[in-house]
Amino acid sequence: MKIFLTAINAKYIHSNLAVYNLRAYAKDYQEQIAIGEYTINNRVDYILEQIYKAKPDVLCFSCYIWNMDYVEELITEYHKLCPEVPIWVGGPEVSYEVETFLAEHPQVTGVMIGEGERTFEQLCGYYVNQAGSLDEIRGIAFRNQDSGKTVFTLPQEPMNMSDIPFCYDHIENFENRIIYYESSRGCPFNCSYCLSSIDKKLRFRDIELVKKELAFFIEKKVPQVKFVDRTFNCRHDHAMEIWRFVKEHDNGITNFHFEISADLLNEEELALIHDMRPGLIQLEIGVQSTNETTIREIHRTMKLELLKDIVRKIQSGENIHEHLDLIAGLPYEDYATFAKSFDEIYALKPNQLQLGFLKVLKGSYMYEHAAEYEIVYHAKTPYEVMKTKWLSFDDVLKIKQVEEMLEVYYNSGQFEITMKVMEPLFDSAFAMFQELGVFYEEKGYFGMSHSRIRRAEILLEFMREQKSEDAVLQMLEESLTFDLYYRENCKSRPLWAPSPAEFKEQTRYYCKNGVKSHVEPFHYRFPEKSKKALNEIPTRLKQPVYMLFDYENRDPLDHQAHVTEVAAVSMAEETKSAGKAKLC
């Protein structure tokens, strides 16, 4: 007997915690369970071939918005090849409107609804032991063979989180991939767009068990552990125990990612966070909107000014990589109010500002009230908003331009200095990205692959069309040069940069003995990292200053080179120092 669990991930570096939990919990049937993990970048035919070669006796699929189209095609095609093999599905994408799903997919034997660990174990017993009946298994829906009607069994009782065995014993199978870890399940909040709000029974894994498992990850030096807890810090003592543990057992390599509610953080937690190694943890903070009417309508609990204050306090330690999230397309959010939300959160200058679009998920409050809000969304996954009562499709398209420009020029971290010096030249940050997006659209640059240096050239083209003064363009040329060398020692020198022959003495003096470094002259002192925003552009200096980019000592948060201003060196000094070692 072979029961085959199929996971189709969004990226290779992802792993599917759900299928590993299912196998771990069904411990009496380990030998009969196999897992096949693929990605949406694999051809459907390739996945189909692999499943067929595995020759499963029972085929199961883990279903999410990013893979549902693939799953539906695989179900259809595999059933043609092996109609005798039962096909079961589970996951958030099939746990709602189950009867409709089964009616539309006659190839599917049944659906595992909600939490699947105990249900899957019982299903394994049913097939392996060839005993009992499906209607004795809680948490499933299946088609009655005689009447064709959908049969729903009793729902499963909520899982005790500590009963789920650790699923990463064979950690070598997850090399170069993100480890997903769950220390709690459920959410205390009631956000209308989110499925986590439906599970009101908040449960936590035993803290000593959590510590033991985190110690395993730390010992194995895995690169990243991403907690999937919906609001990690909703219980203060639980969060403190885990943060204290990872701090005390830090191996200098492993990074931990947490999704938190910033306005729940207290001074004790902030003090602990500030004392951590730079890069030890990442924090993802959902804001979604700053429009008070929108926040109330989506049932979100958030004290905005407190959140901003906490975000600034986190940043003051200069040791935490911080993501802030916004959602376009929420009720009562029009183009103008979204632009305001964007500018308010962009002003905080997080390491990344994730701009997403509303997904109308089956089972959510938003799904039930979509008609009331006049939300039009895609019929296919991921059910992304197209327009609402407040936001036209034209507006959505404009915001999508902003999103792409934000990803390329801000979230990439590759144009940090240039974004800072450009912002004062526009009415707002949102306007800057919007106008840049319009420029890309007019020039046909969207949809094309551009090198990093080409992205810089396009920025200069854009600013020339803005009829910027020569002084501004000179400054931008230098800021772009700074940004290009900030990340790496460029193989191709930008065309606008001065010839290296003009400062060869500095290069010979400061970049010796094979040390990975670069020296460059600038006529501007550009803002340091701690300077989040500028009120005016920098003043041009009469004489250049020389900046040394050290690629062997990078910032642990954004991996930019360490940069220091160094003294100008004359040819006589350079000659005098010949043969002597110089630290870079």
Where do the PLM segments sit?
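N-terminal [4Fe-4S]-dependent radical SAM core
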Residues: 1-3, 137, 141-183, 556-570, ...
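Radical SAM [4Fe-4S] cluster-binding motif and immediate context
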Residues: 162-316
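A short, flexible N-terminal coil/short beta segment enriched in small residues
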Residues: 1-20
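Glycine-rich beta-alpha loop elements in corrinoid/cobalamin-binding modules
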Residues: 2, 18, 25, 29, ...
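A structural motif corresponding to the C-terminal lobe/cap of the Radical SAM core domain
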Residues: 236, 248-251, 255-264, 268-432
